[in-house]
C-alpha cells in the first residue's frame, strides 16, 4: 500500500525558532516513516518581500542545514528548493487563470502583509496563495500540515483543485489539512498570550534555533510569569499564561508530562522553573547547533541533497504538469 503524501514548505527568510521546531519540525521528523514526506524550501515565496540576494542564498542553505540537523532525512523524505523545480511556477501561472480576483482579495494574510510592506504591495504578494496551491497540487498531496495562519490558503487550494477537476476530470487530489497528534504551541516569552514568531520585532520574545545558548538562558530568566504570592507553579493557560508557557517548553524538551512537572515544582519559586527551562533549552540547542554546523560546513553535501531532492520532486511534478497542460489544450512539446 502506498504511503499518503504529505507536503510542507517553509520560507528561507527569518531564523527558525524553538516554536517552529517544537510545533512543526519535530512532527515532520516523526512523520517520515509513515508518510511519503515532501519538504520544500520556498524561495520563490520569499521574494514577495524585498530580499538581499546574498542573504537569501545564505538563508536557503542555512534552512536546509537546519532541517537536516533537526532530523529530516533525505534518504526517507524529498527535500528540495522550490526554484530548482520550474513546474511550481509553470503550474502557478496556469492556476492563476482558474482563480478569481475576489478570492485573492479576501485573503487575510495579503491584507496583513500589505499593511506591513505598504511600499511594496506587488502582484506576487497578491498571487502568493495560488503559487502555494501549485506547490501542494503538483505532488497529488493527500495531507498538508497547517497552522492557523495558513488554513485559509489551504481552503483556497482545495477550491482551485475542485474547480479544475469539475472542468477537466480528476486531475488533482484534493488535499486535506493535517493536524499532528502532538506539538507544543510555544508562546512569546514576554507576551505569553501570543504565539512565538520568528518575525517578532522584539527579539526578547523569541528563541532562535541558532542563538547563543548563553543569550537564551538570559532571555528565559527574564520571561514573564505572574505576581502570585506565594508563587504557584501550576498549568493554567487562562490565568497563568507565562508559567504555562514555560511548563509547555520544558515538557516538550524533556518529555515529562505537565502533571509530573507540576508535582516536581510544588512549593518552589518561579526562579527554579526558569532555571530548569533555561538548562534544558540551552542543552538541546547546543546539541542541535553542533549537528547544524557539521552540515552547514559541508557545502558539497548540501548541494548534493538539493540536486537529488529536485530530481526526485521533478518526477512527480512533471507528471502532474503534463496532465494539466493536456487537459487545458496546450500542444505537447515535441
From Swiss-Prot:
Record's keyword terms, sorted? Aminoacyl-tRNA synthetase, ATP-binding, Cytoplasm, Ligase, Nucleotide-binding, Protein biosynthesis
In the record, the note on similarity to other proteins reads: Belongs to the class-I aminoacyl-tRNA synthetase family.
GO biological processes:
tryptophanyl-tRNA aminoacylation
Q: Which InterPro entries match?
A: aa-tRNA-synth_I_CS, aa-tRNA-synth_Ic, Rossmann-like_a/b/a_fold, Trp-tRNA-ligase, Trp-tRNA-ligase_bac-type, Trp-tRNA_synthetase
Query: Gene3D superfamilies from the xrefs?
Result: HUPs (3.40.50.620), Tyrosyl-Transfer RNA Synthetase (1.10.240.10)
> Could you tell me which SUPFAM superfamilies the record lists for this protein?
Nucleotidylyl transferase
Q: How is this protein named in the record?
A: Tryptophan--tRNA ligase
Query: EC number(s) on record?
Result: 6.1.1.2
Q: Quick one: a GO cellular component term?
A: cytosol
Its source organism is Shigella flexneri
Stored HAMAP family: Trp_tRNA_synth_B
Listed GO MF terms: ATP binding; tryptophan-tRNA ligase activity
Instruction: List residues binding L-tryptophan.
Output: 135
Compartment(s) where it occurs, according to its Swiss-Prot or TrEMBL record: Cytoplasm
Which residue ranges does the UniProt annotation give for the motif 'KMSKS' region?
195-199
Free-text function comment from the UniProt entry: Catalyzes the attachment of tryptophan to tRNA(Trp).
On whether Cell membrane is a keyword of this UniProt record, the answer is: no
Its top-level enzyme class, in one word, is: ligase
Catalysed transformations (reactions): tRNA(Trp) + L-tryptophan + ATP = L-tryptophyl-tRNA(Trp) + AMP + diphosphate + H(+)
Q: What CDD domains does the annotation carry?
A: TrpRS_core
User: Per UniProt, where does ATP bind?
Assistant: 11-13, 19-20, 147-149, 186, 195-199
User: 'HIGH' region: where is this motif?
Assistant: 12-20
| Assembly and oligomerization | Homodimer.
